[in-house]
A protein has these predicted regions:
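Early extracytoplasmic/lumenal segment of secretory-pathway proteins
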Residues: 23-91
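A ligand-binding cleft/hinge motif common to bilobed small-molecule-binding domains
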Residues: 88-91, 220, 225-243, 292
Length: 351
């Protein structure tokens, strides 16, 4: 997805943590286990947290929400803080796999933007604390795409045959088709889903490829000129190619959240609370945003601490009042099997 696990990054994390454990033979009094997306934290933050609190951070990474779920339900490993996305948080809450957070221990939660509190997947904000957020839209090459780009319909325009990239992702791609047709990206109406399937099958003749993170390089290099893209990736791509721009289509789109939660079987809840509170400090947030270029901080006042190319970006910091309707993915329960079937049919279809 938007955060691909990298061996080099994991090695860097291990090096930082091993170095912080060295010196004068001291051993931290406490430790916590954190499970997060790859390439999603500045390693220096972990070092600074340990230095300031004496709590050692054992840090591990995953590549998808599904990997996280499997680890939480089938592994003996116990984590104190994990960072799932919206729909997975909803599922974890339903299944009793996360605990309510004592927000009296998270005073920095007051720093979180009000618009990001009480999200649909945690409406009373009992279980989760925002980590990063963003949108899904279209990135396009202004020098090559002369039509106005403000609608998902551009991805079905025959003029751009073999220039269009779609995500190789069931929820993301079906979500685009559903929004284009005026439906919710969480639709459980099979008639609507059949319409979305039909439109995606018809579109296949125009598509350069269904790709994951590797689609970024294809667009930056100019081999394709239109692509569905996460805002965090889009800003980085725009810095690499000045001809690129990003828009959230007028029909609406996905607003995604990755948030910190504490698993039910956490071994060090107090340490987890300290870590979550630390991650909400403005200076810590600013450091992390600079490291993870393109992702948007949920904390008030961080924007002013960032370089001009980030803080002035309407991609990272859009005017929320001017955005089209946005919705986050929801856990669909057993109905996800219908999505699985339809996605398989789309992939197997011949034009």
């Amino acid at each position: 997805m938007k955060q691909m696990k990298k061996i080099i990054f994991a090695f860097a994390i291990l090096m930082v943590l091993s170095l912080t454990g060295c010196g004068k033979g001291k051993t931290p009094k406490e430790e916590i286990y954190v499970y997060n997306w790859g390439e999603y934290i500045d390693p220096q933050i972990l070092k600074d947290f340990q230095k300031g609190t004496g709590i050692k951070v054992n840090y591990d990474t995953y590549a998808s929400n599904e990997d996280l779920y499997i680890k939480m339900t089938q592994s003996q490993d116990k984590y104190d803080v994990v960072v799932p996305s919206d729909y997975m948080i909803e599922r974890l809450i339903k299944e009793g796999l996360v605990r309510e957070i004592d927000f009296s221990k998270i005073p920095n939660f007051a720093n979180v933007e009000d618009i990001l509190k009480n999200p649909s997947f945690d409406p009373e904000n009992k279980y989760s604390v925002p980590y990063f957020w963003g949108t899904v839209g279209i990135i396009y090459n202004k020098a090559e795409v002369k039509d106005k780009v403000d609608s998902w319909n551009i991805l079905w325009n025959e003029k751009y045959k073999n220039q269009i990239i779609m995500y190789n992702s069931q929820r993301d791609t079906l979500g685009v088709a559903l929004k284009r047709l005026g439906y919710s990206l969480n639709s459980t109406n099979e008639k609507e889903l059949q319409e979305a399937k039909k439109s995606l099958i018809e579109q296949k003749a125009l598509v350069y490829a269904y790709l994951d993170d590797d689609g970024r390089d294809v667009v930056v290099q100019g081999d394709a000129n239109l692509s569905v893209m996460y805002s965090g990736d889009a800003l980085l791509m725009m810095q690499q190619n000045e001809d690129l721009d990003y828009v959230v289509p007028k029909e609406g789109s996905n607003i995604w959240y990755d948030s910190m939660v504490i698993p039910k079987n956490a071994q060090n809840v107090e340490g987890a609370e300290k870590f979550i509170n630390y991650m909400l400090e403005k200076e810590v947030q600013a450091k992390n945003v600079k490291h993870c270029v393109g992702y948007t901080s949920p904390v008030k006042g961080v924007k002013e601490l960032l370089p001009d190319e980030i803080k002035n970006s309407k991609v990272a910091y859009p005017d929320m009042d001017k955005l089209p309707p946005l919705e986050s993915f929801k856990d669909l329960g057993d109905f996800i099997k219908v999505y699985d079937r339809i996605w398989t049919e789309i992939n197997a279809s011949n034009l």
